[in-house]
Regions:
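Non-ligating segments of multi-cofactor redox enzymes
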Residues: 1-79, 85, 89-90, 96-99, ...
Length: 131
């Protein structure tokens, strides 16, 4: 009985003096791993326009059906996304949208802070994704 008590206390004391594993979150932030998939971002070309040509491949390949694109054309008859919305409440962050894009217009970032107060704030539109 006493031997088991001493063993238990020795294990407790050993762990008591070790460095803590948990981070104090808002003050200390963990750096994501190299292959981490966070919130999506739309890329711009050198002229400042979105690289996206509204081909709908990302929306087609998305298993959660979280992407909605409505194509439009500019005065030079180039297609661009008139509406580009990602519902992060449905997104499973699989990265298939990034792999399917032929123009490398959509990228997964290292941003993982997604806390919002309203469900509508989980809908990221084109302007938000281009930041």
């Amino acid at each position: 009985m006493i031997k088991a008590l001493i063993q238990g206390l020795s294990i407790t004391l050993k762990h008591f003096f070790q460095k803590p594993i948990t981070l104090r979150y808002p003050q200390q932030k963990r750096t994501p791993y190299a292959r981490f998939r966070g919130v999506q971002r739309l890329e711009k070309d050198p002229e400042g326009r979105p690289k996206c040509v509204a081909c709908n491949l990302c929306a087609t390949v998305c298993p959660a059906q979280a992407i909605r694109i409505e194509p439009a054309e500019d005065e030079e008859h180039r297609k661009y996304p008139g509406v580009f919305v990602i519902d992060l409440g449905r997104c499973i962050f699989c990265g298939l949208c990034e792999q399917a894009c032929p123009k490398e217009a959509i990228r997964m970032t290292e941003d993982y802070e997604l806390a919002v107060y309203k469900k509508e704030d989980m809908l990221y539109d084109k302007e938000h994704l281009l930041r």
